[in-house]
Amino acid sequence: MTKFKPLGDRILVKRVEAEERTSGGIVIPDTAKEKPIEGTVIAVGPGARDPQGNLIALEVKQGDRVLFGKWSGTEVKLSGEDYIVMKESDVFGTIA
């Protein structure tokens, strides 16, 4: 992957792959798949600044599994792979 470092309070997330088949074995076409709302954090920015200019570090870290909104962030393609760049505030929480 191309080296990418998010700025500010942004994070780079790789979506988990959507299911290809139902439990009954029916193949789901790409047009009918729901966008997964779960992914793995690939890279994190340094954090946001408060009004006094102090750096507030991000709570999520590289490797965390996170849940986020279906329409969160901006989809980008780096080295032929699909990722999402979003603000940390778009993340609902981490998955243990």
Swiss-Prot record:
<keyword id="KW-0963">Cytoplasm</keyword>
<dbReference type="GO" id="GO:0046872">
    <property type="term" value="F:metal ion binding"/>
</dbReference>
<dbReference type="Pfam" id="PF00166">
    <property type="entry name" value="Cpn10"/>
</dbReference>
<comment type="subunit">
    <text>Heptamer of 7 subunits arranged in a ring. Interacts with the chaperonin GroEL.</text>
</comment>
<dbReference type="GO" id="GO:0051087">
    <property type="term" value="F:protein-folding chaperone binding"/>
</dbReference>
<dbReference type="GO" id="GO:0005737">
    <property type="term" value="C:cytoplasm"/>
</dbReference>
<comment type="function">
    <text>Together with the chaperonin GroEL, plays an essential role in assisting protein folding. The GroEL-GroES system forms a nano-cage that allows encapsulation of the non-native substrate proteins and provides a physical environment optimized to promote and accelerate protein folding. GroES binds to the apical surface of the GroEL ring, thereby capping the opening of the GroEL channel.</text>
</comment>
<protein>
    <recommendedName>
        <fullName>Co-chaperonin GroES</fullName>
    </recommendedName>
</protein>
<dbReference type="GO" id="GO:0051085">
    <property type="term" value="P:chaperone cofactor-dependent protein refolding"/>
</dbReference>
<dbReference type="InterPro" id="IPR011032">
    <property type="entry name" value="GroES-like_sf"/>
</dbReference>
<dbReference type="InterPro" id="IPR020818">
    <property type="entry name" value="Chaperonin_GroES"/>
</dbReference>
<dbReference type="GO" id="GO:0044183">
    <property type="term" value="F:protein folding chaperone"/>
</dbReference>
<keyword id="KW-0143">Chaperone</keyword>
<dbReference type="InterPro" id="IPR018369">
    <property type="entry name" value="Chaprnonin_Cpn10_CS"/>
</dbReference>
<dbReference type="GO" id="GO:0005524">
    <property type="term" value="F:ATP binding"/>
</dbReference>
<comment type="similarity">
    <text>Belongs to the GroES chaperonin family.</text>
</comment>
<dbReference type="InterPro" id="IPR037124">
    <property type="entry name" value="Chaperonin_GroES_sf"/>
</dbReference>
<dbReference type="GO" id="GO:0051082">
    <property type="term" value="F:unfolded protein binding"/>
</dbReference>
